[in-house]
């Protein structure tokens, strides 16, 4: 057991999907996995282990934002030996040619969070995805005939911004979308020498106002989940 996860040793697979929403974790387990067991319900942050195409995989909710995902990633790696961590979540598009329900794979993540500046005073550490996981996820998506975008995303500390000027500027520099967790995941994976990836579905467009409902975000976006699972079981 760890502080926030009540699983016993051996109950969590080496490869794990990390949705922010614990109800999405439940949906993934019930929809895509077989022989499922629930190993965590601490603070309602559900975690499950099962099999996908005959291979063992887990799924764990992380909550929203850099501080919350950092708790679960630290504990999954340090206490349970997880080696491959794939975030599956939503993001808001900031490029005109990125549409709602498009799939984005984050190659790296810029951020306004102070997490890395506290670790690297005076430097801006650039965390990146694991290339093997990225390629496997990209190939899985293209084999399904999907238009998968790969590039930079913004990991933001603030959901409700007073000004969108900086977001617009980042878009001018090619950043594809905004989310709230990837930079923490990639930085911790680098610290501990494990593999990480973020596979994201565009749930809304920051500038056009197009959006999906909360129910759709929780129980659809299956293509993103299948891409992540296919990549996870190949590691």
Curated annotation (Swiss-Prot):
One of its GO terms (cellular component) is cytosol. CDD domains: PNP_EcPNPI-like (cd09006). Phosphate binds at residues 20, 24, 43, 87-90. A purine D-ribonucleoside binds at residues 4, 162, 179-181, 203-204. The keyword Glycosyltransferase applies. Keywords: Glycosyltransferase, Transferase. The record marks 217 as: Important for catalytic activity. SUPFAM superfamilies: Purine and uridine phosphorylases. Pfam families: PNP_UDP_1 (PF01048). It is an enzyme of class 2 (transferase). It comes from the Bacteria. GO terms for molecular function: purine-nucleoside phosphorylase activity. The active site is at 204 (proton donor). One of its GO terms (biological process) is purine nucleoside catabolic process. Catalyzes the reversible phosphorolytic breakdown of the N-glycosidic bond in the beta-(deoxy)ribonucleoside molecules, with the formation of the corresponding free purine bases and pentose-1-phosphate. Homohexamer; trimer of homodimers. NCBIfam families: deoD, PRK05819.1, PRK13374.1. Belongs to the PNP/UDP phosphorylase family. This is Purine nucleoside phosphorylase DeoD-type.
